[in-house]
């Protein structure tokens, strides 16, 4: 029933937003650095590099952090770190934006593994169905968000597009509050 799937729709929303942001950074960070912060050519790939590097390194520690703090707290903390990262990206300063992309990688690194962990521990529906819902939302976000960002940026500018990503990360914080209230998901 829909009542049993509802927590996984929340997880799917988080997955959509976070994987969407990942896709947007992969596709748009270099152009953002080039056009908005006016970064020199040798730094335009730095946003994606630092994002990927921090994401990779932090994923090695995610399980330890999860055991210590719990999945929902890790998701909220990751969204908070990514939100701070977007604030730095939106500063318009090349070096602050580079640090911001690094913080995006650090923050987002733990969110998707935790979302998948929660879905896989479902006690209300088959965990494979829960994972399918969450992964489907996430990959849809990864594919659609860069396109939407392109349309928004074409009409309003890259800064507005990245502001939208920042706002969406704030939405993740709100969704974790509602996720915490659900009894069907172990944190």
Stretch-by-stretch model annotation:
Residues 46-55, 137-138:
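Transmembrane alpha-helical segments of major facilitator superfamily
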Residues 85, 95-103:
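Paired small-residue
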Residues 33-34, 65-66, 120, 148-157:
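Interfacial helix-cap and linker-helix signal at transmembrane-aqueous boundaries
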Residues 166-187:
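Multi-pass alpha-helical transporter architecture, strongest
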Residues 125-158, 165:
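A late C-terminal transmembrane helix in Major Facilitator Superfamily
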Residues 6-49:
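Extracytoplasmic gate region of multi-pass secondary transporters
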Residues 110-123:
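Intracellular juxtamembrane helix-capping segments at the cytosolic ends
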Residues 73-87:
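Structural signature of the two symmetry-related core transmembrane helices
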């Amino acid at each position: 029933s829909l009542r049993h799937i509802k927590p996984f729709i929340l997880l799917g929303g988080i997955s959509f937003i976070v994987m969407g942001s990942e896709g947007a950074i992969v596709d748009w960070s270099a152009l953002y650095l080039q056009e908005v912060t006016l970064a020199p050519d040798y730094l335009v790939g730095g946003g994606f590099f630092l994002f990927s590097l921090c994401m990779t390194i932090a994923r090695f520690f995610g399980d330890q952090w999860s055991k210590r703090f719990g999945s929902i707290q890790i998701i909220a903390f990751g969204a908070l770190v990514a939100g701070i990262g977007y604030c730095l990206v939106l500063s318009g300063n090349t070096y602050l934006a580079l640090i911001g992309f690094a913080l995006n990688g650090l923050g987002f690194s733990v969110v998707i593994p935790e979302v998948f962990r929660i879905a896989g521990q479902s006690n209300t529906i088959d965990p494979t169905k829960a994972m399918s819902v969450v992964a489907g939302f996430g990959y849809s976000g990864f594919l659609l968000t860069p396109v939407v960002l392109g349309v928004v940026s074409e009409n309003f500018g890259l800064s507005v597009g990245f502001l939208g990503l920042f706002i969406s990360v704030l939405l993740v914080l709100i969704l974790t509050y509602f996720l915490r209230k659900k009894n069907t998901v172990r944190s």
